[in-house]
């Protein structure tokens, strides 16, 4: 009977439940071994079968087979008797008994059925042998070997009995065959159920096997190691028992040493806790010192500023002293002069008193009295100023005394702090020396040579003690590392103390310097007091000089202020002048270009004026010729009235033709018809009329075309209006650019118009040339020919000349207006370009300032983000440190519990035989997953017998590393490598940082 299965331990199972289950499994295994202890060969047989891979069920089946085959093997081949037949029949098992045995056997039902069938065939074989014996006897009887009747009767009775037995055996065989079939069906059903259960069980095993395979491998390795150690331990058991008696005293010594070492470890832990608390206090004290250092830095900064202010005040006071010394010298000179004047005035008074009849004595007396009153008032003012100076001197001396007392108190406080730090340093050094001495003692105790061991192997108690000693050595090494870290921290603290001592020395030097300055100031004040007597004598005579000095000082201050204002104004004006010079250079370039264009235009205008003068001279000639022709035309009034009316109608029709093309064509046809009729009527004047009409058509058509072009070209002058909704500079720049573009377009259009006007003037000149030549020819023609010229042609010429003259004047006036407009537009363009340049410069300055401010803002944001990141990192490190400390405390508590258990129960060491049972129990606790052969697995390496030592716990090293990182943040690549603005920050309740930049 195998021990019951135990489920594998859960990963979250506690240590106590695991130990209780292990104890229960060990008890059950011991009971099982006690039960199976008498049947040792059976156990060996089971071990062999386990090794060969067979199950115990097969052993039971083989036992059943051997038990049933025994009677068949021992039956004799002789013909049996009735008793033997009955015995044989009794040997055959009944089906009910077979069923009960199959149900009791469980897994060996198939083997039992095989034994049943085997026994029935054996019985049939025996019956056939008996029948063959009877047949052989009958044949012998037939051959002559006669028998008696009694034998025959016996044989017959025997035969009858055998027949009855055959019938009964036949019936029993049928029953057995039916029962065998039923059992086969049941066996098949049970086999199917078993296969299903096996499949389910295999699936469960496959699921559980993956999780438990690693544990099984570990247990297999440990079992192999223990099996390999079992023989050695059994052989060494006697030796160890003898050695145990010898080493009982040694174990007691070791126990006493362990107790002393534990006490020492407890003391070391206490000292370490005290050192850690002292270190925390030192860290807090360092933080307080850093805060005080920052406050002292601020105070030093403020004191430096106050020093600078005081130095400036000292320099001002020295200058005032120099001025006062100069005033004193001048006052002494003035006093001497005034004494001389007084003597002279006294002499004059005596003279005036002696000469009472003198007329101007009263006036001189009044002047002397006025001068005396002025001197007295001046003396009063000087006394008041002296009192004010004394009050200021007293206040300054009191301030100096208060500052010197404050600095002395600060120096005393810093000296006391330095003294306290020195005492703490000495205490820590003494503690470190004591710890080092205790460590040296422990090392000497650990390094003492152990007593010679017997040839037999060490006991488990000694191994455990050695393991505990090694663990204690490791803990001592950890404590030594912590002590070294503490020593390093103490060295860093001593270094900080040295730095603070140096700073204190610097502060003391500054205080001495201040005291020396105070002494110098006292000397200056004493000298001022000594000079006070002399100044008080000269105060009565220094009023006028002081007033002059005050006036001069006021004038000097005014001049300095004016000079500063003038210099600032000059700088601004120089900047403006530079900009204006640059703009003037650009404007001069533009003006040069415009001057060139204006010169070209002026040359063109001069050419046009010359053409105008020529045209006017021609027109005057035309007017003279016209007056000559008028005298000739007066005679032809009666005959030419109708023609004149027709010409007027014709001119009107020509005007309509110019404005309306279609009507003009019809009117032209009508005029041509009327002209043809008139030509028929006036054959004499037809040639002259045709010439005049041709000239009029040449003169009138371009003039009217020009009128139309003028009407078409009369465009309203664009007025430059600045909108009121311009707020931003960008909109102003866009508006200026648009206005400049419009002005350039208008300038181009005006240039095109000028070119067209020039072309028109040229065409008019070309038109006027033939008219002028004709007039000159007509002037040369005699009066007789002039009589032939019609009056209507002269009138038409006169009208054409008037139109031409008016058109020329209008063209010139338009040209002048266009020039003025061009100049205005150029002026507007210059102004707009200047404004755009200034706006562009302002925009560039604004962008530069904005970029600088943005860069500073980005730097501040980066610095704040770095500080926040450092703060988060410190929080994470503190959390890690807390977790590591808790872990270290838990581990130490566990080790202390183990040590206490070992020290309280040093003799409760288990024997080597129960260790094997323990391992078997642990193996059985994991579950009967597969059968392991334990008989032949006795060949593992001897080096694997020892249990591997536990790994070092790195929590203490991590704690020390985190403490170093927290104490020395400069080791991390942070803000120390980058230059930054010094400022102090403090997080409030909402974790918001308020920054005070210095």
From Swiss-Prot:
Keywords: Cell cycle, Cell division, Coiled coil, Cytoplasm, Cytoskeleton, Golgi apparatus, Membrane, Methylation, Microtubule, Mitosis, Phosphoprotein, Protein transport, Transport. It is found in: Golgi apparatus, cis-Golgi network membrane; Endoplasmic reticulum-Golgi intermediate compartment membrane; Cytoplasm, Cytoskeleton, Spindle pole. The keyword Cytoplasm applies. Residues 72-81 have a biased composition (Low complexity). Its main location: Golgi. Residues 147-894 form a coiled coil. Residues 58-69, 271-280 have a biased composition (Polar residues). Changing residue 994 to A: Does not affect with GORASP1/GRASP65. Changing residue 37 to A: Constitutive interaction with p115/USO1; under mitotic as well as interphase conditions. Residues 988-998 are annotated as: Interaction with GORASP1/GRASP65. It comes from the Eukaryota. Belongs to the GOLGA2 family. This is Golgin subfamily A member 2. It comes from Rattus norvegicus (Rat). The gene is Golga2.
């Amino acid at each position: 009977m195998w021990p019951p299965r135990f489920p594998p331990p859960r990963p979250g199972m506690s240590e106590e439940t695991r130990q209780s289950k292990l104890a229960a499994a060990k008890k059950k295994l011991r009971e099982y071994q006690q039960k199976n202890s008498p049947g040792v060969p059976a156990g060996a047989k089971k071990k062999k079968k386990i090794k060969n891979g067979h199950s115990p069920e097969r052993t039971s089946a083989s036992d059943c087979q051997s038990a049933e085959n025994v009677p068949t093997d021992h039956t004799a081949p002789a013909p049996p008797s009735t008793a033997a037949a009955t015995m044989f029949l009794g040997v055959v098992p009944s089906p009910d008994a077979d069923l009960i045995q199959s149900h009791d056997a469980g897994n060996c039902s198939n083997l039992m059925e095989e034994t049943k069938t085997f026994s029935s065939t054996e019985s049939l074989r025996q019956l056939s042998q008996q029948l063959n014996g009877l047949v052989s006897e009958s044949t012998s009887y037939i051959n002559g070997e006669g028998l008696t009747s009694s034998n025959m009767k016996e044989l017959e009775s025997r035969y009858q009995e055998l027949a009855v037995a055959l019938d009964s055996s036949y019936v029993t065989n049928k029953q057995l065959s039916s029962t065998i079939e039923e059992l086969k069906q049941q066996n098949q059903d049970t086999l199917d159920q078993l296969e299903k259960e096996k499949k389910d069980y295999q699936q469960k095993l496959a699921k559980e096997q993956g999780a438990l395979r690693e544990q099984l491998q570990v247990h297999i390795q440990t079992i192999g190691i223990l099996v390999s150690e079992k023989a050695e331990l059994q052989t060494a058991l006697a030796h160890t028992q003898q050695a145990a008696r010898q080493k009982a005293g040694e174990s007691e010594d070791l126990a006493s040493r362990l107790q002393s070492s534990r006490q020492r470890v407890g003391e070391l832990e206490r000292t370490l806790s005290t050192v850690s608390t002292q270190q925390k206090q030192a860290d807090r004290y360092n933080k307080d010192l850093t805060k005080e250092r920052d406050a002292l830095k601020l105070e030093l900064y403020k004191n430096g500023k106050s020093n600078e202010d005081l130095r400036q005040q000292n320099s001002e006071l020295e200058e005032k002293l120099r001025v006062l010394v100069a005033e004193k010298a001048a006052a002494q000179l003035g006093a001497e002069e005034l004494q001389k004047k007084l003597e002279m005035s006294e002499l004059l008074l005596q003279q005036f008193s002696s000469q009472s009849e003198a007329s101007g004595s009263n006036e001189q007396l009044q002047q002397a009295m006025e001068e005396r009153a002025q001197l007295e008032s001046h003396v009063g003012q000087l006394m008041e100023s002296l009192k004010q100076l004394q009050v200021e001197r007293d206040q300054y001396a009191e301030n100096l005394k208060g500052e010197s007392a404050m600095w002395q108190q600060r120096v005393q406080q810093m000296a006391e702090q330095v003294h306290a730090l020195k005492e703490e340093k000495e205490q820590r050094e003494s503690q470190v020396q004591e710890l080092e001495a205790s460590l040296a003692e422990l090392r000497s105790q650990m390094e003492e040579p152990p007593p010679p061991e017997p040839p037999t192997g060490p006991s488990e108690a000694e191994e455990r003690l050695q393991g505990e000693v090694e663990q204690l050595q490791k803990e001592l090494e950890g404590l030594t590392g912590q002590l070294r870290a503490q020593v390093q921290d103490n060295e860093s603290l001593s270094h900080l103390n040295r730095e603070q001592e140096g700073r204190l020395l610097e502060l003391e030097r500054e205080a001495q310097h201040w005291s020396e300055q105070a002494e110098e100031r006292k000397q200056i004040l004493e000298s001022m007091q000594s000079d006070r007597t002399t100044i008080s004598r000269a105060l009565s005579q220094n009023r006028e000089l002081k007033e002059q000095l005050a006036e001069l000082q006021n004038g000097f201050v005014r001049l300095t202020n004016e000079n500063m204002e003038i210099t600032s104004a000059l700088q601004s004006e120089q900047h403006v002048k530079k900009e204006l010079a640059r703009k003037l250079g650009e404007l001069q370039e533009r003006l040069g270009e415009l001057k060139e264009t204006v010169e070209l235009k002026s040359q063109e205008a001069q050419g046009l004026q010359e053409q105008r003068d020529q045209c006017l001279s021609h027109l005057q000639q035309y007017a003279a010729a016209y007056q000559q022709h008028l005298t000739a035309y007066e005679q032809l009034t009666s005959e030419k009235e109708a023609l004149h009316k027709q010409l007027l109608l014709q001119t009107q029709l020509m005007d309509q033709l110019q404005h309306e093309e279609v009507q003009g064509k019809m009117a032209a046809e009508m005029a041509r018809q009327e002209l043809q009729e008139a030509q028929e009527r006036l054959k004499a004047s037809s040639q002259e009329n045709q010439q005049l009409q041709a000239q009029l058509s040449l003169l009138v058509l371009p003039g009217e075309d020009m009128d139309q072009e003028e009407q078409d070209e009369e465009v309203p002058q664009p007025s430059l209006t600045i909108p009121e909704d311009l707020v931003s500079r960008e909109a102003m720049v866009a508006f200026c650019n648009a206005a400049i573009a419009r002005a350039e377009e208008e300038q181009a259009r005006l240039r095109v118009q000028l070119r067209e006007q020039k072309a028109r003037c040229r065409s008019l000149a070309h038109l006027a040339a033939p008219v002028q030549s004709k007039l000159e020819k007509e002037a040369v023609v005699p009066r007789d020919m002039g009589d032939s010229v019609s009056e209507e042609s002269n009138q038409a010429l006169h009208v054409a000349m008037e139109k031409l003259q008016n058109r020329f004047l209008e063209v010139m006036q338009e040209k002048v207006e266009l020039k003025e407009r061009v100049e205005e537009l150029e002026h507007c363009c210059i102004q707009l370009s200047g404004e755009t340049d200034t706006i562009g410069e302002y925009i560039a300055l604004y962008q530069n300032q904005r970029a600088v401010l943005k860069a500073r803002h980005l730097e501040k944001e980066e610095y704040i983000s770095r500080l926040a990141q450092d703060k988060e990192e410190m929080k994470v490190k503190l959390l890690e440190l807390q977790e590591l400390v808790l872990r270290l405390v838990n581990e130490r508590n566990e080790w202390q519990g183990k040590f206490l258990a070992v020290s309280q129960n040093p003799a409760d060491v288990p024997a080597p035989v129960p260790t094997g049972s323990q391992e078997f129990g642990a193996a059985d606790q994991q579950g009967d997953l597969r059968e392991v052969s334990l008989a032949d697995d006795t060949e593992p390496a001897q080096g694997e017998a020892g249990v591997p030592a536990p790994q070092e716990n790195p929590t203490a090293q991590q704690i020390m590393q985190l403490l170093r990182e927290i104490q020395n943040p400069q080791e991390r690549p942070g803000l120390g490598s980058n230059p930054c603005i010094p400022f102090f920050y403090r997080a409030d309740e909402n974790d918001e940082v308020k920054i005070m930049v210095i």
